[in-house]
Design a protein with these regions (language model features):
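N-terminal, positively charged, Ser/Thr/Ala/Gly-biased leader segments
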Residues: 2-4, 10-75
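Conserved glycine-rich FAD pyrophosphate-binding loop
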Residues: 2-6, 11-13, 46-49, 72, ...
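N-terminal glycine-rich flavin-associated loop
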Residues: 42-75, 91-93, 99-147, 161-194, ...
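Short hydrophobic/aromatic beta-strand micro-patches
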Residues: 53, 238, 287-289, 338, ...
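Short, conserved charged micro-motifs
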Residues: 59-62, 129, 243-252, 293-300, ...
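Anion (oxyanion) recognition and catalysis
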Residues: 68, 135, 258, 356, ...
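C-terminal substrate-binding/cap subdomain adjacent to the FAD-binding core in PCMH-type
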Residues: 158, 177-333
């Protein structure tokens, strides 16, 4: 497990290269925007050597070129909300250390073409600020990511963080239409939107989404926008109301609703063990958006399928419940799973059996039915590791996946948090080599140690 600080490594040539890089970086962005790293900058126990805050896409590209020449590993950081996602950083003891590159100063909303319903924004802009600006013209980026007040656009893209809105509107890859990436060789690659330059024929916006900053550092993105709905209504069904008895029944109801003419913009299933009643044993949440008349018509049609729903007066609490999975007793695991929507009931049964056998409290929030988040708590790290390996094996056998987002470092050192990439891994390594030949960006943190 790599827990070293970069200051503890380095042959003399690497130390000299790092000192030259520090000087060059100060010249590039100004001395006030380069500093020595502190303990709070650590990523999974690795304290970088220095922190830089470029102020433009060109400065990001220039910083990457300097870092590559000096043999520095580069760790991108936006709002810092998901810095513990991914595998352990590959040890850099034979090189010069690590450079943490913050996009904090890249926070401009470059253009809001409200007539075309598109917007261009820099990577360091927070999601909340972006939404507030778009709302002035009655528009929005139709996403509901985690921690919207502090999560940045670049970080949301790098981690592919969508939410319940994807049921109707689509995922992040459906909304991004252009991107600018700073590459390790110091160039800016642009694709989509109004831009003219493509990179080797790749669909760069989709490729960069979810890549955890391992191909290039996102500096700008162009998005397709949607109108802010006039009205929104949230209904919730529970296992004690409406005749449903478990999460599988809730899932069946959710699928039945989506198979009819109703078009909820949010579908969410909440579940938990008896020791986590604050989440509700089994709850199904539906969000309808549009005109008041349209929302009420869809609610009326929904109630013809299943009775016992209650209207939620504070819907923000319901739709933000996913973020509560990051709080609770430790040690714990927080995982993201994906599966066929029809398999969610079976997955819930597997979780219940494992929880009962190993005495592990759990909570689950499934958004878009086939994509969700699971928290498992336990006093023994070895038991947690056994539980997640068993659940992952069973999910992967049915074509699903289980990615560990947060866990103790002891577990991270023993497992690939991403799971198996299967036959896709050689292709992923090939793409990585084309964009980042020397492995400068977030080395080791992506799938298969990429």
């Amino acid at each position: 497990m790599a827990t070293h600080s970069s200051s503890s490594s380095s042959p003399e040539v690497s130390v000299a290269a790092a000192e030259t890089a520090w000087s060059d970086l100060r010249t590039l962005v100004g001395g006030e925007h380069v500093r020595a790293a502190i303990a709070e900058d650590a990523v999974d126990g690795v304290v970088p050597q220095m922190v830089i805050e470029p102020g433009s896409p060109e400065e990001v590209a220039g910083a990457l070129k300097i870092a590559t020449s000096a043999g520095l590993h580069v760790i991108p950081r936006g709002g810092g909300t998901k810095m513990d996602w991914g595998n352990l950083l590959r040890n850099n003891e034979s090189r010069s250390g690590e450079l943490l590159l913050s996009t904090r100063r890249l926070n401009r909303i470059v253009e809001h073409a409200w007539g075309d319903m598109t917007a261009t924004v820099e990577a360091g802009c927070t999601f909340q600020r972006f939404q507030q600006t778009l709302a002035q013209h009655g528009q929005r980026l139709a996403l509901d990511p985690l921690w919207p007040d502090s999560a940045t656009i670049g970080g949301i893209l790098a981690t592919n963080d969508s939410g319940a809105l994807r049921v109707r509107i689509g995922s992040l890859r459906d909304l991004i239409i252009g991107i600018t990436l700073a590459l390790p060789d110091g160039t800016l690659a642009k694709s989509g939107g109004k831009v003219v330059k493509n990179v080797a024929g790749y669909d760069l916006p989709k490729l960069a989404t979810g890549s955890l900053g391992t191909l290039g550092i996102i500096t700008q993105a162009i998005f397709r926008l949607h109108p802010v709905p006039r009205e929104s209504r949230t209904l919730s069904f529970s296992n004690s109301e409406g005749g449903t008895s478990d999460g599988g029944s809730m899932n069946t109801l959710a699928l039945a609703i989506q198979d009819c003419n109703m078009v909820p913009t949010g579908v969410q299933i909440r579940a938990g063990s008896a020791s986590t009643p604050e989440l509700g044993l089994h709850e199904l949440d539906l969000r309808f958006e549009g005109t008041a008349t349209g929302c009420e018509a869809q609610i009326e049609q929904t109630l013809r399928i299943a009775s016992g729903a209650r209207r939620i007066e504070s819907p923000a609490d319901v739709w933000n419940v996913r973020s509560t999975l990051w709080s609770g007793a430790e040690p714990s695991l927080v995982c993201k799973f994906s599966l066929l929507p029809v398999d969610l009931g079976t997955f819930l049964d597997l979780i219940r059996k494992a929880s009962a056998l190993l005495h592990l409290p759990w909570r689950l929030v499934a958004q878009a039915v086939g994509v969700g988040y699971l928290r498992i708590e336990g006093s023994d790290v070895a038991v947690l590791l056994h539980a997640v390996e068993d659940l992952r094996k069973k999910l992967e056998s049915r074509g699903g996946s289980l990615v560990i987002l947060r866990c103790p470092l002891e577990i991270k050192s023993k497992i690939d948090v991403w799971g198996s990439a299967g036959d896709a891994l050689p292709l992923m390594r090939s793409i990585k080599a084309q964009f980042d030949r020397t492995g400068v960006l977030n080395p080791g943190r992506f799938v298969g140690g990429i």
